[in-house]
């Protein structure tokens, strides 16, 4: 895995996500047509600075109760937290909601934002919903498919797998950059080169 230095991560975090997309069009022109979110999303905290980190991935459902034993589900949740904790830092959690339509129940709110922040995660990008916005962990960014009031029967399906969130395909350990506009995957091979092409450019 190609890891960036703290200075390079900080430099990328100083850019908004559209600027990163502009740079990718130069250093990896084939990615003009993929690798970023393409559907509208909601941002819980638009005033926060962009986040950039290594992807930790999972998939969820919420419309129906889980079919597995409660003991098994509890152990899976503990294994998932260990997975988040053991990954490279900083991290961004990317969660695909498998329900149709997505967002029936929120995995993310006051509890999960605080747990994940404590495990070194800067924020989440999800096709699902988020809730408890005023009470979520300070400085933790949440970019989601929708806001919602209930968690319904939300549960993990699996984790550490490839996911798709609003048109953006993400593999574990991918470098993800996100802000109020959405998110983009930065290929490790060109991540450093992106910083060479971040001067102001046309937005159209």
Positions of predicted regions on the chain:
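N-terminal low-complexity or amphipathic/hydrophobic leaders
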Residues: 5-79
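Structural motif
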Residues: 31-33, 54-57, 91-94, 121-125, ...
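A contiguous pocket-lining binding segment that forms or flanks enzyme active sites
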Residues: 126-127, 132-178
